[in-house]
Swiss-Prot record:
Cellular location(s): Cytoplasm, Cytosol
Cellular component terms per the entry's GO annotation: cytosol
Protein name: T-complex protein 1 subunit alpha
Function: Component of the chaperonin-containing T-complex (TRiC), a molecular chaperone complex that assists the folding of proteins upon ATP hydrolysis.
Subunit note: Component of the chaperonin-containing T-complex (TRiC), a heterooligomeric complex of about 850 to 900 kDa that forms two stacked rings, 12 to 16 nm in diameter.
Transmembrane regions listed in the UniProt entry: none
One family name in Pfam for this protein: Cpn60_TCP1
Record organism: Ambystoma mexicanum (Axolotl)
Keywords from the named record: ATP-binding, Chaperone, Cytoplasm, Nucleotide-binding
UniProt keyword Transmembrane present: no
A Gene Ontology molecular function term of the record: ATP-dependent protein folding chaperone
Family to which the UniProt record says this protein belongs: Belongs to the TCP-1 chaperonin family.
Length: 173
């Protein structure tokens, strides 16, 4: 079992290296991209004067699911960590002197935000771009469904619904 797991880990690492070489660029990991994009889109949404503002703001909010999930999976306080992450990325976008904060991502081992460029925590740009694109396309597909899917109660062999069969006691042995 241990050898299989090691083989998968080495394979995964080689795939990451392959993606980095293909895309020739990396982005900081640990939710940094999602936090930065969320802040940017929230600011952009406030400049809109139409109903599109609501959709953009909600999409921006949805991007924070990634850093929140990272924190929750590591049993960390996701609210506090994501708030700090957002504060760093907001500062990086509004203050030109603090542009270096754009590299801040989550350090889940120590439960804090850190400079992931210095820590060497990166993701291939191609992987990040594709994952955001596919997730967005999946959400759009779901939103385009305009049919009501109705499930009818199951019926047993006597023509009764499951709830009726439970009430009548016909399911008991």
């Amino acid at each position: 079992f241990m050898c299989d797991e090691m083989e998968r880990s080495v394979h995964d690492a080689l795939c990451v290296v392959k993606r980095v070489l293909e895309s020739k660029s990396v982005v900081p990991g640990g939710g940094a991209v999602e936090a930065a994009l969320s802040i940017y889109l929230e600011n952009y949404a406030t400049s809109m004067g139409s109903r599109e503002q609501l959709a953009i703001a909600e999409f921006a909010r949805s991007l924070l699911v990634i850093p929140k999930t990272l924190a929750v999976n590591r049993a960390q306080d996701s609210t506090d960590l994501v708030a700090k992450l957002r504060a760093f990325h907001n500062e990086a976008q509004v203050n030109p002197d603090r542009k270096n904060l754009k590299w801040i991502g989550l350090d889940l081992v120590n439960g804090k935000a850190r400079d992931n460029k210095q820590a060497g925590v990166f993701e291939p740009t191609m992987v990040k771009t594709k994952s955001l694109k596919f997730a967005t396309e999946a959400a759009i597909t779901i939103l385009r469904i305009d049919d009501l899917i109705k499930l009818y109660p199951e019926s047993n062999d006597k023509g009764q619904s499951y709830q009726d069969a439970v009430r009548s006691g016909s399911l008991e042995n």
